[in-house]
Amino acid sequence: MQIEIKDGRSDNSPLPERKLVTLIQESYDSLKDDNEINLSTESTSNLLIKLVLEKLEKHSSLYKYIASVTTLNIEGLNEENANFSLKNDIGASWESKKRWYIQL
């Protein structure tokens, strides 16, 4: 899997771009290496989102995180048939118990 960050505002991110790419790649690799997960039957994108959000929370719980995975399935794509499917899964995470106030 190739991971790229395009047109994002990674300069505002709690993680540097390179570290974020590494975090996502490590999460994906751990899914592939897990023998108990059947990648052909389970929703890999949801599992990946969960892993990425867990790692981001470990990095810092001061932020709100939104993770989105878009999957393009081209199994039915050939010269005679232009069928494909596109799926997008989204997950979010934040620490609801932490409230930040500015006292003036």
From Swiss-Prot:
Keyword Cell cycle: no
Name assigned to this protein: Topoisomerase I damage affected protein 2
Keywords in alphabetical order: Cell projection, Cytoplasm
Major localization class: cytoplasm
Top-level taxon: Eukaryota
Organism the protein comes from: Saccharomyces cerevisiae (strain VIN 13) (Baker's yeast)
Record family assignment: Belongs to the TDA2 family.
Keyword Cytoplasm attributed: yes
Name of encoding gene: TDA2
GO cellular component entries: cell projection; cytoplasm
Localization of this protein: Cytoplasm; Cell projection
